[in-house]
Amino acid sequence: MNSIPSFNSYIERSIIKNWHLDALTDYKGATLQYHDVARKIEKLHILFENSDVKKGDKIAVCGRNSSQWAVAFLAIITYGAIVVPIQNEFKPEQIHNIVNHSESKLLFVGDVVATEITPDEMPTLEGIIYLPDNSLVISRSEKLTYAREHLNAMFGHKYPKYFRPEHVKYHVDDPEELAMINYTSGTTGFSKGVMLPYRALWGNLDY
């Protein structure tokens, strides 16, 4: 593994190498192969790019463990944005506080969280995306709305003759570059964000 230069390079090579193998399975649900994961990641990258999401912007994810949660996480990391995972069990006010404190631009939510949070409590968010199907719960950005409505057409225009392994090209990360802000459970007050660089994620894989 030490011959692979970065975390995202490892993800990229794993997807290409295992293109037709099973990657993610939901309990009593569907199985995604690596090429399915790659396709979903690429669609989210197109959505981010056309919504003016820049590398280094923060994107939060809050939902139960699922293949769609994993896809969103990987899409954020491999785009070069900073992922802010939020525990699904947190109360709405904790979620609001973390989104605001982290200055997240977008928020992915699962089915339960979507019904509990109050978008008006997170005024700087540009959009909330529903994890099960990547539909928009709310959009405050015309570019985000347009990109989501035309996402399939944008994908087809970019890849008119199928999406293939050679199209998988991810953000080249630096070991010291910020990858994730992980918030604690906040047992002594408000949750505190721990800033994790890419080398921390790579260290977990290498271990």
Predicted stretch roles:
Residues Q33-H35, Y170-H171, A179-G203:
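Conserved AMP-binding A3 loop
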Residues D57, A81, E176-E177:
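Surface-exposed loop/turn positions
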Residues Y10, N50-S51, T78-G156:
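Structural core segment of the AMP-binding/adenylate-forming
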Residues W19-H20, R148-Y183, F190:
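Conserved pre-ATP/AMP-binding loop-to-beta segment of ANL
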Residues S3, H20-D52, D57-L74, K91-H96, ...:
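Conserved AMP-binding/adenylate-forming core of the ANL superfamily
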Residues I59, I76, L107, L178, ...:
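Conserved S/T- and glycine-rich ATP-binding loop of Class I adenylate-forming
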Residues W69-I77, V83, L201:
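Short hydrophobic alpha-helical segments of the AMP-binding
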Residues I41, H45, Y198, L205:
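Short amphipathic alpha-helical/adjacent loop interface patches that line ligand
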